[in-house]
Design a protein with these regions (language model features):
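A short acidic, Gly/Pro-enriched loop at the edge of an enzyme's catalytic core
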Residues: 17-28
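C-terminal lobe and adjacent flexible extensions of AdoMet/dcAdoMet transferase-like proteins
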Residues: 96-142
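Conserved SAM-binding strand-loop segment of SAM-dependent methyltransferases
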Residues: 6-18
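Short, glycine-/aromatic-enriched active-site segment of Class I SAM-dependent methyltransferases
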Residues: 65-84
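Short, small-residue-biased leader/transition segments that mark boundaries at the very start
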Residues: 1-5, 137
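A short SAM/SAH-binding and catalytic strip from SAM-dependent methyltransferases
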Residues: 27-40
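A short glycine-rich, Lys/Arg-flanked "PGG" loop and its adjoining helix->strand segment in the class I
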Residues: 42-57
Length: 142
């Protein structure tokens, strides 16, 4: 493993509902299949808004719900830890982002991910309820 130092990059360990950084410090927040695991998604987006500089960008790749998940699937711990059962609907994510203060919100479901999702849990039919998506939002400039 080769260690490379970047002056403009900072990695910190913390909880996504309570980020260990100052207000308005980050230019970009990147998240890959993590937010669906949080039971406090609205808080995650509020924290993201807090730490981004005005004009800062939120860039997320995550699983979103395209239909209401049956209770059996929602309560399946393997599907939850597999980043599927905790997925929120596109409408709910958009509302949480708006409530946090973001604008220029774009949520793009990737229908081509259904085959990949199907392979995660073939017998569950989870692909009928979730899909991978890119989620982008901007913290408005003051």
């Amino acid at each position: 493993f080769r260690r490379v130092l970047f002056r403009s990059v900072d990695f910190r360990l913390g909880e996504i509902e309570n980020l260990p950084v100052a207000d308005s410090i980050a230019d970009v927040i990147i998240s890959n299949c993590v937010i669906n695991l949080s039971p406090e998604k609205a808080r995650v987006f509020q924290e993201s808004f807090r730490v981004l500089k005005p004009g800062g960008r939120l860039a997320i790749s995550d699983v979103v719900a395209t239909a209401e998940l049956p209770v059996k699937l929602k309560n399946d711990m393997a599907l939850y830890t597999g980043c599927m059962a905790g997925a929120s609907s596109i409408t709910d994510i958009e509302a949480m982002l708006k409530d946090a203060g973001f604008d220029k919100i774009e949520i793009k479901p990737k229908d081509e991910s259904k085959e990949f999702v199907r392979n995660w849990a073939p017998a569950s039919k989870i692909e009928d309820y979730v899909v991978s998506a890119t989620i982008e939002a901007i913290k408005p400039k003051a």
